[in-house]
């Protein structure tokens, strides 16, 4: 079977780190689109899954590209495509499916501990308490109707699932260079910026690499969906052949 074809909706406003990071972490054929342009695929057909990246925008801002992106994502969900949102993408998926995104009134940034429930395919092989880099001042305040919270910490919900849709608030794709660049770009007190920079160490990055497993797990989920669709297609084809044979026998 060929590698899965994934639509990557890049919402990162020309940040050079974002495409590099997702190309490195996603072992798939990627079709990349600049959502801010706005540039979106003409159709959801031809893709096996969708990834929505982070962004410096807020989901609730009145920017002309945000709602078309949400509408396209809803179409992909309705078509049964597995979706993964990261940070802003996590929030957009929640918003698109009827959840609530709100300002936190504070900033979570740096390598932080997060806890997951231990029974999700997304976190298979990840310790229930794990480390990941975080940077956000908005949160999914309420997950979409019918969704399950998969992970959280003392700041916010950090992962949810609804059917074939997964969102993670943390950044499993970040390398140390990205973590430093993002931190230096924040409008925060100098002392806090320095504390976060001091925490971007090889040891903390090594600990956070465990969180990258969510990409492998999500792609494995995509493959399972593909295989199920192929099996279903074969079964439907066999049923049609049986029906045609029965019709032919009746004609005789």
Range-by-range predicted roles:
Residues 21-23, 47, 64-67, 98-101, ...:
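Short, glycine/charged-enriched secondary-structure capping and boundary segments
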Residues 97-177:
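Pocket-forming structural segment of enzyme catalytic cores
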């Amino acid at each position: 079977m060929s590698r899965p074809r994934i639509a990557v909706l890049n919402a990162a406003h020309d940040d050079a780190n974002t495409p590099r990071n997702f190309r490195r972490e996603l072992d798939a054929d990627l079709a990349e689109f600049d959502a801010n342009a706005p540039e979106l695929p003409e159709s959801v057909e031809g893709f096996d899954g969708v990834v929505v990246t982070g962004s410096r925008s807020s989901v609730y801002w009145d920017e002309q590209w945000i709602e078309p992106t949400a509408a396209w994502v809803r179409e992909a969900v309705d078509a049964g495509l597995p979706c993964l949102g990261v940070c802003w993408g996590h929030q957009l998926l929640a918003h698109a499916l009827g959840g609530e995104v709100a300002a936190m009134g504070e900033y979570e940034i740096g390598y932080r501990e997060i806890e997951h429930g231990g029974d999700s395919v997304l976190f298979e092989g990840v310790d229930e308490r794990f480390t990941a880099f975080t940077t956000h001042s908005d949160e999914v305040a309420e997950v979409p109707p019918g969704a399950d919270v998969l992970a959280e910490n003392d700041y916010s919900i950090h992962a949810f699932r609804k059917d074939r849709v997964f969102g993670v608030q943390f950044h499993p794709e970040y390398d140390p260079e990205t973590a430093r660049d993002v931190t230096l770009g924040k409008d925060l007190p100098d002392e806090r910026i320095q504390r976060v920079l001091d925490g971007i160490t090889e040891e903390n990055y090594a600990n956070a690499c465990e969180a990258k497993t969510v990409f492998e797990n999500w792609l494995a989920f995509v493959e399972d969906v593909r295989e199920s669709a192929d099996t279903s297609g074969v079964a439907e084809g066999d049923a049609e052949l049986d029906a045609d044979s029965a019709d032919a026998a009746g004609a005789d």
